[in-house]
């Protein structure tokens, strides 16, 4: 009898903790929207080419995100998910406007989750369209 109560408490804690664990890993679907509508749009406009998540492996994306270097080291990658950047483009970009109030760290985790989800060596290699 005494074993049932701790087991029940543990089960409730696990069930309640699952959404927090999923949130800590990022929302790849929201990351996909942001990546495609903000990152891809900018890359196509500035360089004439997009960078699909499937162009890199999970390890390559992790190294890129950890290095926090964008535009061959000229910029911080984090700037492109910052509220300052989103505010600067929200008049012409619906995703930047839609996610204007999302915390920067959360949005960065979403983008990380998307590129990891769509990486070359994932189960779902993803393009940009």
PLM-predicted stretches and their roles:
Residues 41-48, 66, 116:
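Detector for the c-type heme attachment site
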Residues 67-93, 99:
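Short Fe-S-cluster ligation motifs
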